[in-house]
UniProtKB/Swiss-Prot annotation:
Keywords from the named record: Chloroplast, Plastid, Ribonucleoprotein, Ribosomal protein, RNA-binding, rRNA-binding
Location of the protein in the cell: Plastid, Chloroplast
Family: Belongs to the universal ribosomal protein uS7 family.
Protein name: Small ribosomal subunit protein uS7cz/uS7cy
Subunit record text: Part of the 30S ribosomal subunit.
Any one GO biological process: translation
Pfam family, one: Ribosomal_S7
NCBIfam families xref list: rpsG_bact
MF annotations from Gene Ontology: rRNA binding; structural constituent of ribosome
GO CC, alphabetical: chloroplast; small ribosomal subunit
Gene3D superfamilies membership: Ribosomal protein S7 domain
InterPro entries referenced in this protein's UniProt entry, alphabetically: Ribosomal_uS7 (IPR000235), Ribosomal_uS7_bac/org-type (IPR005717), Ribosomal_uS7_dom (IPR023798), Ribosomal_uS7_dom_sf (IPR036823)
Length: 155
């Protein structure tokens, strides 16, 4: 067993324009091959498109989207007696937020369209309206947890 002390939880630094940690987390999830300036451009263009399309504050749309996609429960594989069970577990707020952002970015990438900025803007707007692939992913996860409720005692 390690003798070192437990590592502290690191929080994302807020981004320079919106001064928001969620935006910073989004940028870090969009990031590919270390091109952070490109990730910044993509998200800020998406935010401008959201403002133009919805006539609302893009930060509130992003917050609403993340809130709507955040799962309450998830399933975790647990091996008991030679067989694997999908055990439903509650999701902590920080993990839920990270999952929501990951699902939104993944759904944006899988969406058909030209630029990542437009795909991201459409996915964020859809998630804020409670539709879209990311919402479907959350509902799938909840259904899976509901179906495996019988194994909740295996935690």
């Amino acid at each position: 067993m390690s003798r070192q002390s437990e590592t502290k939880k690191r929080t994302a630094k807020s981004d320079p324009i919106y001064r928001n940690r969620s935006v910073s987390m989004f940028i870090n999830h969009i990031l590919k091959d270390g091109e952070k300036s490109l990730a910044h451009k993509i998200l800020y263009r998406a935010m401008k498109q959201i403002k133009r399309k919805t006539k609302k504050n893009p930060l509130s749309v992003l917050r609403q989207a993340v809130y709507r996609v955040t799962p309450n429960v998830a399933v975790k594989s647990r091996r008991v007696g030679g067989s694997n069970y999908q055990v439903p577990v509650e999701v902590k707020p920080a993990r839920g937020k990270a999952l929501a952002i990951r699902w939104i970015v993944g759904a944006s990438r899988n969406r058909s369209g030209r630029s990542m900025a437009s795909k991201s803007s459409y996915e964020l707007i859809d998630a804020a309206r409670n539709t879209g692939s990311a919402i479907r992913k959350k509902e799938e996860t909840h259904k899976m947890a509901e179906a495996n409720k019988a194994f909740a005692h295996l935690r």
